[in-house]
């Protein structure tokens, strides 16, 4: 234990003298140290009363010593306390009270006629000095003249509120201001009563009330409930209940005549969003924002136009959402091209720029269209009436039969072909397709089967006919030569095919063997050259400093071929071979 420790039990309270505060602490004996530890254990177990500070508050015995011990510069007497751990009053912020507020209005009646000590020497105001005065410097200041002393400035107090004071909506409210509204309503009520009394006096003087009282309906109690007199008497109630229908609660109905509230017990047919589709894989419902963006009936196969609710995503395509998205896209594109525009920073500038851009774009399209029409023509096709008018009702009378044939009126026009008609090229006298033979189309004038051929006339017909005769004669001779049976013909064909296959196999074997050997030799030569180049490259790299060598990751990693393995074996050095020294010679 250090010599600075003091027994809290034996320590006497400090009297406040300097001699007591400057005494050196006495060294604790072993017995005192043991008693102190036992007392601490008893306090922790609750068998002994806890320590008490100067304010009479109990000190928790479980607080560590490095927290509960008082520094020497705060209290040299070492009295048990936790005051040094609490917020110090001199460091606490002083907040304004709830009754304090800024001054409202300026007192204009008080006028100062005499210079006051400590005021501005130039104008005479008490709220500033001469160097801070904003008034024009006078030739002789107010300190010496004592005239034209300026009024004091309206200086507002510096208020500093806490968290709740800053958020108090009624802070600075004067309840006396509400009395003005009460007085105004009282005056209106008094004016209504005077007007009503004046009206009754006029009716009594004119005799209307006497006539109504002597009427037979009034005597037998058959007066109409909506008579003029009842309306006049209930005018005040009507004024009070004028806006009753506008402020009634949902599900309630306010009867202004009987002054009762009637519950509207109707059946609510609306369905909650999350109950429209109970499938957990359907549209997601966010309970925090009460939003369901997707359509809950998307998987049910229902048309969104026929459903009462199809999700909240329609809000994204209503109002100015689409135009704002187009403006944002234009801002991004303009910023990429060097224009300093931003949707949030300069919305007005961006809107004007976007409008001018659209006007210039339309003008450019019109100019481009006009230039194309001037160069190539075709304005008459653009001036044609729209398709709606072309297919509209006409005055032509047409009568049809049950089967769709025209009985009376304009007959149906013949459908035109999509191919060119009556177009004769290359001196042909007939069109292409006028002649057909053996599944082929041609020209009738020369019997030619080539579409873009030149016409040969009758000579072409004769040449075609002679070729056909020669072909037919040769086939006839072959047929007359050997009248063989089908079995013999089939056997001959098989023999010829076998001979051809044998010849092909022999030719393939001889050619393939020689070709394979040549290819292998070429591949091996290439692999040997590549291996020599690799060895030279390795030799160069080994001569370079280890830190300056390139990375191995730049080389391709693949499985080597047979030729590359053979070249590696042929070029590999074998130190165990006795003839290895003669390989380099």
Curated annotation (Swiss-Prot):
**Could you confirm whether the keyword Cell wall biogenesis/degradation appears in this record?**
no
Query: Where in the sequence is Phosphoserine found?
Result: 215, 227, 235
Principal localisation: nucleus
Which biological process terms from the Gene Ontology are attached to this UniProt entry?
A: alternative mRNA splicing, via spliceosome; cellular response to heat; intracellular protein transport; mRNA 3'-splice site recognition; RNA splicing, via transesterification reactions
* Cross-link Glycyl lysine isopeptide (Lys-Gly) (interchain with G-Cter in SUMO2), where in sequence: 349, 408
**Pfam families per UniProt:** Slu7
Compositionally biased spans, kind Acidic residues: 235-248
The UniProt entry annotates the motif Bipartite nuclear localization signal at 129-169
Sorted alphabetically, the Gene Ontology cellular component annotations on this record are: catalytic step 2 spliceosome; cytoplasm; cytosol; nuclear speck; nucleus; small nuclear ribonucleoprotein complex; spliceosomal complex
Location of the protein in the cell: Nucleus; Nucleus speckle; Cytoplasm
Q: Basic residues bias located where?
A: 498-509
Q: Which UniProt keywords apply?
A: Acetylation, Cytoplasm, Isopeptide bond, Metal-binding, mRNA processing, mRNA splicing, Nucleus, Phosphoprotein, Spliceosome, Ubl conjugation, Zinc, Zinc-finger
**N-acetylserine sites (modified residues):** 2
Domain-level remarks: The CCHC-type zinc finger is required to retain the protein within the nucleus and prevent its shuttle back to the cytoplasm via the CRM1 pathway.
Functional summary from the UniProt entry: Required for pre-mRNA splicing as component of the spliceosome. Participates in the second catalytic step of pre-mRNA splicing, when the free hydroxyl group of exon I attacks the 3'-splice site to generate spliced mRNA and the excised lariat intron. Required for holding exon 1 properly in the spliceosome and for correct AG identification when more than one possible AG exists in 3'-splicing site region. May be involved in the activation of proximal AG. Probably also involved in alternative splicing regulation.
Q: What is this protein called?
A: Pre-mRNA-splicing factor SLU7
Q: Which organism is it from?
A: Mus musculus (Mouse)
Q: What is the lineage of its organism?
A: Eukaryota, Metazoa, Chordata, Craniata, Vertebrata
- Coding gene? Slu7
